[in-house]
From Swiss-Prot:
It comes from the Bacteria. HAMAP family: Ribosomal_bL31_1 (MF_00501). GO terms for molecular function: metal ion binding; rRNA binding; structural constituent of ribosome. Belongs to the bacterial ribosomal protein bL31 family. Type A subfamily. PANTHER family: 50S RIBOSOMAL PROTEIN L31, CHLOROPLASTIC, LARGE RIBOSOMAL SUBUNIT PROTEIN BL31C. Pfam families: Ribosomal_L31. Keywords: Metal-binding, Ribonucleoprotein, Ribosomal protein, RNA-binding, rRNA-binding, Zinc. The gene is rpmE. GO terms for biological process: translation. The lineage of its organism: Bacteria, Pseudomonadati, Verrucomicrobiota, Methylacidiphilae, Methylacidiphilales. Binds 1 zinc ion per subunit. This is Large ribosomal subunit protein bL31.
């Protein structure tokens, strides 16, 4: 193998949002994750809602009041 072309492979800590800390090896000094085996509903057996709002709901909440081109918000269609 060639020298000085590979990244530095070192011991790293993985920190979860629930407070669990794991140690492994990686090229990064530390890694932060949002969910792990200690708090994931599949592994704990507890049913809890992990995602508070999906991407579609966030979009609808943010841009739901905007009318798009070609749509009329309060205008009635004229009948002949």
């Amino acid at each position: 193998m060639k020298k000085d072309i590979h990244p530095n492979y070192q011991e790293t800590t993985i920190s979860c949002a629930c407070g669990a800390v794991y140690t492994t090896k990686s090229t990064k000094p530390s890694i932060r994750i949002g969910i792990c085996a200690s708090c994931h509903p599949l592994f704990t057996g507890q049913q809890k809602f992990v995602d508070t709002a999906g991407r579609v709901e966030k979009f609808a909440r943010r841009f739901g009041k905007i009318s798009f081109i070609g749509e009329s918000s309060n205008k009635k269609k004229k009948t002949k």
